[in-house]
Structure formats: C-alpha cells, structure tokens
Amino acid sequence: ERGHISVSEIEMTHLPSAYIREEDDIKTGLGDACSYTITKKKNDIYYLDLLDKRGNIVVHAKRHNADVMTGMWRIDKINGNEIEDSDLEIVVDVPELKIHGKTGCNIFNGDIGLDRNKDWFIQFQNIIVSRMKCEDSKMAVERDFMVALEETEIIKRENGGKTIRLLDRNKKEVLLLKRIQQ
C-alpha cells in the first residue's frame, strides 16, 4: 500500500528519556515525509516506511502485533492442565498496557511489557492480587495462574485470533486462552 502524507507543527515533550535522540530523529523524519508505504511481512507483521520527496526512507516503523491480545479471555489450560468450570478471566488492554481479571477467588491488575524488537512478544508485570481466602483447590489454581502469567513471553495466535497460546521463553505453553469478547 502506498499513499501521501503531510505532517506539520510537530510537538514533543522532551522529558528526560533514553530515547531522546531517537525522538528527535522521528520528529525530523515526520517533518521530511511526503509519502508512505505499508508492507506486510510473514506472520502478519506490518511495516510503515515514511519517505521524503526523493524516495528515501526517513522513518521505518513496525506495528507491534500484540494487539491481537486486546479483549476478554477465558483461561482453559494452565501448563497443559485443563481448568474445569473455569471462571478465570483476563482482560487485556494492549493500547493502555494494562491487564485485569478474575482468578476464580480474587481479582488482579497489572501492566503489560512489550519489546518492539521482538515479534509476538508480551510480558505481564507488576501484578497485584486481592487477598481473599478461598478453598485450597482454588488457591492452588490461582497460584499456578499467577506464575504462568509472570512466565509468559510469546503469543501464539490460532483460529483467527479466537484462541491464544501463551508460551514461556523456552516456547513451552503456559496458558491457553479462548476469546470471550473483543
């Protein structure tokens, strides 16, 4: 896909950041851009190139593919073990980098970590859980669920994004999720 673009009056915060040089490069690139191309590569990875009037690439960007996770999910398996009568749910909000949900006993909230240099990468961080006491079997499932969330690093999409397998760094499945709603 190819098109034209015009960007003007660019403002940036310039708060202290490790990416400040990169932000200046992006600002300059946006100012010079007059056209763009969008390219789809393998595994549904999209790239945006902004081009100057001579056709030189001034900004090269990759769309992070974790957006497929945004929505409400039911947890069907933890570490390969089926969860019977699962009332474990997770709501993932990739644009806001937040998660929340139910463990079957407690509720939880946390943050999402993305690495723009790794395809299909996601981490769940800073997870906090309410402290209700439930029957031992529910507490064991909750504990396994929280550990699996913390081990997650890879998204594996199936069935058109209706099923997600979350894998650890060794590509072992830690969670199987089924979409409840977008």
Cite the ranges covered by each PLM segment.
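Lipid interaction determinants
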Residues: 1-182
